[in-house]
């Protein structure tokens, strides 16, 4: 009896086409093009999850440095002073404070410098 592997192949193709939903042109409905596009997209998403962490950390550092300079110090001096004072606030929280609550950020800078 001949076995045509219909169910398995159809399920595999449908899975790929479902992942390709939202793509433009033949990449959304032609299996071969969709498969290539989905594979590339998954590779990029893996790479960019790591890049996202780096980019956010750099953004936080830029924001903290700008706020620190408004308070008469620099980023590196502020971080060293915070560590020496035993203040354990991460860069994400510091950047949010610098942006949303500049007064509280200034108080933290004074605490670190004291």
Curated annotation (Swiss-Prot):
Keywords: Ribonucleoprotein, Ribosomal protein, RNA-binding, rRNA-binding
SUPFAM superfamilies found in the cross-reference section: Ribosomal protein L20
Cystine pairings recorded for this chain: none
MF annotations from Gene Ontology: rRNA binding; structural constituent of ribosome
Keyword Nucleus attached: no
Cellular component annotations (GO), alphabetically ordered: ribonucleoprotein complex; ribosome
RNA-binding listed as a keyword: yes
Extent of the signal sequence: none
GO term, biological process aspect, one: ribosomal large subunit assembly
Record InterPro entries: Ribosomal_bL20, Ribosomal_protein_bL20_C
Family: Belongs to the bacterial ribosomal protein bL20 family.
UniProt function note: Binds directly to 23S ribosomal RNA and is necessary for the in vitro assembly process of the 50S ribosomal subunit. It is not involved in the protein synthesizing functions of that subunit.
Protein name, entry field: Large ribosomal subunit protein bL20
Gene name per UniProt: rplT
């Amino acid at each position: 009896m001949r076995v045509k592997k219909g169910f398995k192949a159809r399920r595999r193709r449908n899975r790929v086409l479902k992942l390709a939903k939202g793509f433009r042109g033949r990449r959304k409905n032609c299996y071969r093009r969709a498969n290539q596009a989905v594979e590339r997209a998954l590779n990029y998403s893996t790479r960019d999850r790591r890049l996202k962490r780096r980019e956010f950390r750099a953004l936080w550092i830029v924001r903290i440095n700008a706020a620190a300079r408004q308070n008469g110090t620099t980023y590196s001096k502020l971080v060293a002073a915070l560590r020496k004072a035993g203040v354990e606030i991460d860069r994400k929280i510091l950047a949010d404070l610098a942006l949303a609550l500049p007064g509280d950020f200034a108080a933290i800078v004074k605490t670190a410098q004291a």
